[in-house]
Amino acid sequence: MAIASSIGLVAEAIHRHKTPERPIESENDIARYPAEDEQWALDELQDELCQEEPSDSEDQPKKKIRNPAKLADDFLKRYPPPPSGSAPAGRLPLPVIIPQRRPGVRVRGFVRAYAPDLQACGIDQDTFMDFLVTMTRAGRAPQWMGAANLTAAAAFALPGHAIGCGVGFAIQVVNAIAMEMRGRVQANGFLQKLNQGFFQPRGLYCLVLSFDNTHEEAMTDESLATAIATTTDPKTGVRKYTDKLRSHSGTTGPSEFPESAPLVFPVLDWLETNANAEQAEKLGRYKKFRKFVADYYDRRAQAEYAARNPTSPLAAPPRRGFTSKLADPNDDTNKSPISLATGGLVPYNTTWRETRNSEGRRPPRKIADKVLYMIIVNMPSDDDMSRAESIMATEATTEPSVQSDDAEAAKG
């Protein structure tokens, strides 16, 4: 339970602060707590250590807004496609998945991180950092609409696309305040242009997705292929216009990511050898805290697995116990929101919900609701695209009411 684990972390941190510091046991595995929390913290640490305000955020409304089409053209001039006839670029072994910088504030862009796997595809670190900064500028809403504050918001959902294995994929469009609507048009058009002139010539495709955790199946390569086919398919009628308003390429489920490429944080790497005394002190403190948090979640995982699998040879309890019952996942206090609120007086009687696999490892990375993710994948093959398009075409014939609604709206 996330609430209990967070409360337990605070309790452990307070005890650690009051007692002599001891070495952390899991120093070789310091990134095993929730991925988005880790990435957001590292991204914010980069800003803090450099003592810079985000240069492309809502915090600087007076900065000149450039035409996103011009931004895309300038970027493509700086980084033209590979010459025709050149050796084909490499392929990504895993998709690159980068979350937005701060939930709920889309114009902040995405976490400033780089996947070294992109190097084999012809995209080096400096190029990718330039892309992230430029995309953030392209998505900033125009100043002259800053006074608009429309409170009405409505959701308009295009039909979902049934994908193999029952994975649901649906494009959702939210009509919110006018400033955000205009900003969404800019970011969407910029990314489409960059896909055509930058990513696709290098064998890649970049799309921005949000996720609907109500679906029960795991996201697959086929669902990504369908999302790409959807964004590259010419639009007509209402779909042509709603496509321009959506802030992300699609909404898909469910709650688990596929395995993704490792990320590095360029500013932190640079500071490892170039930091001044104050920056080095902050960086050192943060590293210690990361190790402490990773050790805490690692001990919770070991304790939970040992409780559920007492006869397994892998079920070794953590070598170091918990200083508070609020931190111990096996204490009755932490087994449900009710037991937590009552201090364990109301018992938890239902069965354990599985959160670890049979080997006691941490579960797959969970997708956060209401968060946008930038995903870069290998461009699907023609066969993959054809299969995805046929799935969409088949579904379209089974939804006459939706299609007729689109047609009527287009006529209007």
UniProtKB/Swiss-Prot annotation:
Residues 1-66, 308-342, 386-412 are annotated as: Disordered. Pathway: Mycotoxin biosynthesis. Coiled coil: none annotated. InterPro entries: Burnettramic_acid_biosynth (IPR053221). Keywords: Antibiotic biosynthesis. Transmembrane segments: none annotated. The keyword Transmembrane helix does not apply. Residues 395-404 have a biased composition (Polar residues). Residues 36-58 have a biased composition (Acidic residues). One of its GO terms (biological process) is antibiotic biosynthetic process. Part of the gene cluster that mediates the biosynthesis of burnettramic acids, an unusual class of bolaamphiphilic pyrrolizidinediones that display potent antibacterial, antifungal, and cytotoxic activities. The first step of the biosynthesis of burnettramic acids is the hydroxylation of proline by the proline hydroxylase buaE to generate 4-hydroxyproline. The PKS-NRPS buaA and trans-enoyl reductase buaC construct the highly reduced polyketide chain, and the condensation (C) domain of buaA then catalyzes the amide bond formation with the activated 4-hydroxyproline. This is Burnettramic acids biosynthesis cluster protein E. It comes from Petromyces alliaceus.
